[in-house]
Amino acid sequence: MGGISIWQLLIVALIVVLLFGTKKLRSLGGDLGGAVKGFKNAMSSEEDKKALEDTEAAKTAQTTQQATEKKPESNKEQA
């Protein structure tokens, strides 16, 4: 008592199919699937962008660090 049984779920599903029809439910399912796929693609492209930006930032930091390390050596040679 208090829980939803399998029979109650089947009756609700049958009523939904009778009200909307299988074609409309199929197109609704396809639209929902397309929306989920688009959302996943957008999320993965955002992750790719962040990874690319992080990689570029690391390269820039490494280049800057190397340039900074080379400057004191050139100053020592001049003195």
From Swiss-Prot:
Annotated signal peptide: none
Keyword match Transmembrane: yes
GO molecular function, one term: protein transmembrane transporter activity
Basic and acidic residues bias locations: 46-57, 68-79
Residue span of region Disordered: 43-79
Matches recorded under Pfam families: TatA_B_E
Keyword terms: Cell inner membrane, Cell membrane, Membrane, Protein transport, Translocation, Transmembrane, Transmembrane helix, Transport
Cell location: Cell inner membrane
UniProt topology in membrane: Single-pass membrane protein
Main location: membrane
Composition bias, Low complexity: 58-67
Presence of the UniProt keyword Magnesium in the record: no
Membrane-spanning residues: 1-21
A GO CC term assigned to this protein in UniProt: TAT protein transport complex
Highest rank taxon of the organism: Bacteria
GO biological process: protein transport by the Tat complex
Function of the molecule: Part of the twin-arginine translocation (Tat) system that transports large folded proteins containing a characteristic twin-arginine motif in their signal peptide across membranes. TatA could form the protein-conducting channel of the Tat system.
Subunit and partners: The Tat system comprises two distinct complexes: a TatABC complex, containing multiple copies of TatA, TatB and TatC subunits, and a separate TatA complex, containing only TatA subunits. Substrates initially bind to the TatABC complex, which probably triggers association of the separate TatA complex to form the active translocon.
UniProt xrefs under PANTHER family: SEC-INDEPENDENT PROTEIN TRANSLOCASE PROTEIN TATA (PTHR42982:SF1)
Record-stated family: Belongs to the TatA/E family.
Protein name, entry field: Sec-independent protein translocase protein TatA
Source organism: Shewanella baltica (strain OS155 / ATCC BAA-1091)
